[in-house]
Amino acid sequence: MTLKIKSGYRLNVAMIVLNEDNKILFCKRRNTENWQFPQGGVDEDEHIETAMFRELNEEVGLEKDNVEIKAVSQNLIYYDIPKNIRSRVLGGKFKGQAQKYFLLKLISGEVDLNIENTPEFDKYSWVPFWYPSNQVVDFKKEAYR
C-alpha cells in the first residue's frame, strides 16, 4: 500500500487496543511522564499492516494472533512536533508524523512491556475511551480526538 504523505512527515502506525471491558490500552513512555497509544514508524517498502503488527509486538509484546482488527482510519492523521524538541525526536529529521490508526480488540494474551532490552514504555493502564485525548502530550491532543 502506497500512501501519499505530506513533505516532512514520517509515516507512522498507532494502535488503539481494546480489552474485554472495552477499555483502551494507554502506555507511559519510559523516563518521562508522557502517556500515549503504542505507535511506531513504517519502514521503507513495508506494508502498513505489517508495520502495525511489528510495532505492536515490539512495544507491548502482543502478536498478530492476540488481536483482531476492528477498524482502520481511512485518512492519515497528522501532528507536528514542536520546533523546540524536534532535534530530540526522530533525530530531528521530520517536522511531524502522519499516522494511520488501527482499532484492535485484544482476544488473547497479555501486555508485556519488558520484551526487549530497551522498552519504550515502563507502565500501562486500561482507561475509558475519553481519557487519552485529555492526558496525551499537548502536541498530540488534536490527533487523539
Where are these regions (language model features)?
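Unchanged
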Residues: 42-138
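A short acidic/small-residue loop/turn micro-motif
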Residues: 32-33
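Active-site beta-strand termini and strand-to-loop segments that position acidic
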Residues: 17-20, 29, 104-106
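Short connector loops at helix/strand junctions that flank enzyme active sites
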Residues: 10, 37, 95-99
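Acidic, metal-coordinating catalytic segment for phosphate/diphosphate chemistry
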Residues: 1-20, 91-92
